[in-house]
Amino acid sequence: MEQQKQHVIRAVRADEWEKVRGLRLDALRDPVASLAFLETYEQAAAKPDEFWQERAAGAAEGVDVAQIIAEAPDGRWDGSVSVFIEDVGTSDFLGQVVDVDQAHVVGVFVRPGQRGSGLTDALFEAALEWVWARQEPVLGRARLFVHEENERAAGFYRRFGFRASGLVVPKPDDPSAKEHEYVISRP
């Protein structure tokens, strides 16, 4: 936990799009990226600057999406988590109709050297603080999906208070693999 105290946990700013892109590309180079992300390094690297500029600007506005980062004293970003709102009646990433106003946690990444330091806890605390502070609509839960083979991540989510909902879906880019939905209810 001592490492975490050296980091500033905060939302991204619109002008930080290059760091948003850099951290995402680093995350997609991680050995477990194929379990944790639906996008490949090659797909992300091919996206134009405008994509990253829009992503950073949207997250900085914090209306329907937020990206929380862990910034080291030297300015390096050591982790990130993103959250977006899923409104009732919209379609989720699987094409299913959303039946409850909720948040969806995605893009969880902490650099290998910082794992176990408390950064993931700090990122999730800030992300869920953003979720629970939302007033319109008030969100009753947050959810995320975890690959069936990503036990380290699943263990963290359970320890943090998420519970398996029982919903199991095929991984969009590999239907032979399964992803489990985990949810946490508003305190």
Regions found by a protein language model. Name each.
Residues 107, 111-125, 136, 148-155, ...:
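Conserved glycine-rich acetyl-CoA-binding loop
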Residues 8-22, 34:
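A short beta-loop-alpha structural element at the N-terminal edge
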